[in-house]
Amino acid sequence: MMVHCAGCERPILDRFLLNVLDRAWHAKCVQCCECNCNLTEKCFSRDGKLYCKIDFFRRFGTKCAGCLQGISPSDLVRRARSKVFHLNCFTCMVCNKQLSTGEELYVIDENKFVCKEDYLSASAIKEVNLNSVSSCTDRSLSPDLPDQIQDDTKETDNSTSSDKDTNNNENEEQNSCTKRRGPRTTIKAKQLETLKAAFVATPKPTRHIREQLAQETGLNMRVIQVWFQNRRSKERRMKQLSALGARRHAFFRGPRRMRPLGGRLEDPDIMGPGGYSYYGEYQGDYYGPVVNYDFFPHGPPSSQAHSPAESPYLLSSGSGALEGGPVSAHHPSDDQRFTDMISHADTPSPEPGMTGPLHSNPQGEGGFTGSPPFPLANNTSYSGPMSHPGQEMGENTVW
């Protein structure tokens, strides 16, 4: 029985044949389908086709994330996260320096790298540019960032200005300031929900969490970092506005009305029991709020010394001398309030030279009579009824 070749389907008449994939082949038919080189020692197959080692790994092996070409098993590679790179492809995108193992680098777009020196120098340049354009715009995203975020309408800040004013301000900013660099990044609703949930859990996520969010949402790492920065800034502004509103509400709140003093003074629960509650604890005759006594801390002078019974303490009720006779006592009623007090300079003082004791009225009318006429102080600016408690005081001792 004739044996046919699996490659050319012709009968094999050669002395030697090759058995590949459990089928007979001519020696010349066992070759790579890509480069047509003869496979004498080793071959690789996929979908019934034969490949050499180089072409097989080039087409079906791991690809370099930099050049997107296949990586041969004999090639030296470097790994960054889940990506594999050729040594020549693992370079800084700014200075094209080949990055070595253990060197600090910054990943951009998952397959581009920047060495530490170039990143720090670029950050310093960005800070200078930010300071130069800060007078032109105060938007949350700086114009030097490569990607800028446009949140949904639910995430826009509440402001008192209308949409027309906002559009006009944006046009003025674009005309007066430098043009923004890089495209704007639009965050979809599902991506926004994922970022919001992550912000509630950790307002300041670590690099590992940001990497997970980048894999879940498909967004750039830089976009996620800037979104979290803007969200934290927005939370701080909202807290400041709420605190300012609370202070403003407390400041403009209506003032409390002051209650009259007299109503509280006559409350027996506050001032204690007594017929005349304001002076309920004072045991003595009351001569009104305009009394003014001469005070001698070391005793009265020798020429003016008198016994307690002969000390004249009497208020003037008018100009001139007081004639002997009863003087009607005046007691403040419940509706009357003493709101104006006489100053010390306007209060008449008793003359030290007056003599004659005061005697209580035996009829119990609450008045007083003077035995001889009393000279009064030469002060005609004050006149009025003499204030004296009524008979409800129950005590007529002169002091």
UniProtKB/Swiss-Prot annotation:
GO cellular component terms attached to this protein's record: nucleus
Note whether rRNA-binding occurs among the keywords: no
Which residue ranges hold the DNA-binding region? Answer: 180-239
For this UniProt entry, what is the primary localization, expressed as one broad class? nucleus
- Cited Gene3D superfamilies: Cysteine Rich Protein (2.10.110.10), Homeodomain-like (1.10.10.60)
Instruction: Give GO BP annotations, semicolon-separated.
Output: eye development; forebrain development; neuron differentiation; regulation of transcription by RNA polymerase II
The LIM zinc-binding domain extends over 3-61, 62-125
Where would you find this protein in the cell? Nucleus
Keywords from the named record: Developmental protein, DNA-binding, Homeobox, LIM domain, Metal-binding, Nucleus, Repeat, Transcription, Transcription regulation, Zinc
Task performed by this protein: Probably involved in the patterning of the nervous system, in particular in the early specification of the diencephalon.
This protein is called what?
A: LIM/homeobox protein Lhx5
